[in-house]
């Protein structure tokens, strides 16, 4: 897995955002699984994916990698697990548009946290890019926002906040491999899903969707982002991550014929520019 770690940071961030952009489509495609069942299976396959990546990367030193990640890795994993729970809860209880819009606010949290905690200056070009990108997001999803469920909207805020905190930890300790933190997050959220589910077994169709979500969507997504963030400024991470909000509606259009509005197309073009 050395070739992945040698890829440019911004490219890895984009690949991670690309993977994560399928989240809404996958969660909305479950047929009979409950919120907590989705969380359990998604987190289970995610944990296995991260563990497999660590074994392939470290081989006989896999356990040592957890030890070396230390307290930053453990704390980062626990914090991120709340984001995982909030993401599934939001997608289950409110619209994909609402959730994507709220998640896109991570760009603000990243820039602000980076400024205060890492002393990363926000230059005029970056500030302009943030404003331009946020304008694109507002145009893209603002026209289709619905009131939604208050609980789902509030839960969605846990994702950009916990993601920003994780990136701060990654940037603060660039020499520490934070991929083990992803395993901690997966196991923690899997345990939460298990404890809150009345039963674990779901249909084969939904188990397959859980596999897609855990392996492809969040598995590759957060592995790429965690590695890429080590060499990418926090504000730049936020700007690139906005592509998740652009691509999500595109997948909905391609696979479930959900047509984006004219404002959505214009907003997406602004962000990609």
Which ranges hold each PLM region?
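Loop-to-transmembrane alpha-helix entry segments
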Residues: 67, 100-103, 119-139, 146-155, ...
């Amino acid at each position: 897995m050395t070739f992945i770690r040698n890829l440019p940071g911004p490219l890895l961030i984009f690949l991670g955002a690309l993977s994560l952009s399928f989240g809404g489509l996958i969660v909305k495609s479950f047929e009979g699984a409950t919120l907590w069942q989705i969380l359990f299976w998604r987190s289970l396959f995610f944990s296995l994916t991260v563990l497999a990546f660590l074994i392939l990367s470290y081989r006989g030193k896999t356990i040592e990698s957890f030890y070396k990640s230390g307290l930053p890795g453990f704390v980062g994993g626990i914090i991120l697990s709340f984001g995982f729970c909030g993401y599934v809860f939001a997608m289950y209880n409110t619209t994909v548009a609402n959730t994507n819009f709220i998640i896109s606010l991570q760009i603000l949290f990243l820039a602000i946290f980076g400024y205060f905690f890492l002393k990363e200056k926000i230059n005029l070009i970056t500030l302009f890019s943030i404003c331009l990108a946020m304008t694109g997001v507002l145009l893209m999803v603002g026209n289709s926002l619905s009131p939604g469920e208050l609980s789902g909207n509030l839960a969605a805020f846990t994702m950009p906040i916990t993601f920003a905190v994780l990136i701060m930890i990654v940037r603060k300790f660039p020499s520490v491999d934070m991929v083990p933190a992803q395993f901690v997050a997966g196991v923690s959220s899997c345990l939460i899903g298990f404890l809150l589910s009345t039963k674990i077994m779901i249909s084969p169709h939904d188990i397959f969707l859980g596999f897609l979500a855990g392996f492809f969507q969040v598995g590759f997504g957060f592995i790429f982002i965690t590695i890429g963030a080590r060499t990418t400024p926090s504000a730049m991470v936020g700007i690139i991550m906005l592509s998740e909000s652009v691509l999500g509606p595109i997948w909905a259009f391609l696979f479930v014929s959900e047509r984006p509005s004219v404002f959505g197309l214009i907003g997406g073009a602004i962000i990609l520019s």
